[in-house]
Structures are given as C-alpha cells and as structure tokens.
Amino acid sequence: MSITAERKQALIKEYATKEGDTGSPEVQVAVLSERIANLTEHFKGHKNDNHSRRGLLKLVSQRRRLLDYVKGVDHARYQALITRLGLRR
C-alpha cells in the first residue's frame, strides 16, 4: 500500500532539479502520484475502505495544489512535469 524507501529514492533521483533535492514541487508531485497509484490499486480489491478513500482524496488535493503552484511559477515546467508523469490536464 505504501511505497518502499528504494522506490521513493528512485523517484527523488529521477525528478530532482539538483543534487540533494527532496523538496521541490516536481519531486513532491512524483512521490504523491506514486502513492495515489498504489491507493487506486488498493481500491480495486477493497471497494468499501472509506477511511483510506479519504486519505486518497487528501493526497489528490495536495498534488493538485502543488501542480497549480508549478503552473503559476513556470508554465513550461508544469507542462513538462505532467507529460513525464502521464497526468491529464
């Protein structure tokens, strides 16, 4: 259900803008997207898990806010990020 430390480190390395970057919006969105994908898979087998569904909605909202921030700061960076992650919008 949660992502492994190795997978998280791989995402950080892939989306980091510089060495040691763990807090940039790109990294945060990538990690959130991975967690959202894992929870979405969880719901295929556990349709009535409403406590986790609330957590999923919270993660989706947090990702949306980060994406809106990136879009406001640099639209080209936003387009590149959603293309790399395969997100709609």
From Swiss-Prot:
Entry's Gene Ontology molecular function annotations: rRNA binding; structural constituent of ribosome
Top-rank taxon: Bacteria
GO biological process: translation
Gene3D superfamilies: 6.10.250.3130, S15/NS1, RNA-binding
Assembly: Part of the 30S ribosomal subunit. Forms a bridge to the 50S subunit in the 70S ribosome, contacting the 23S rRNA.
Functional summary from the UniProt entry: One of the primary rRNA binding proteins, it binds directly to 16S rRNA where it helps nucleate assembly of the platform of the 30S subunit by binding and bridging several RNA helices of the 16S rRNA.
Full protein name: Small ribosomal subunit protein uS15
Gene field: rpsO
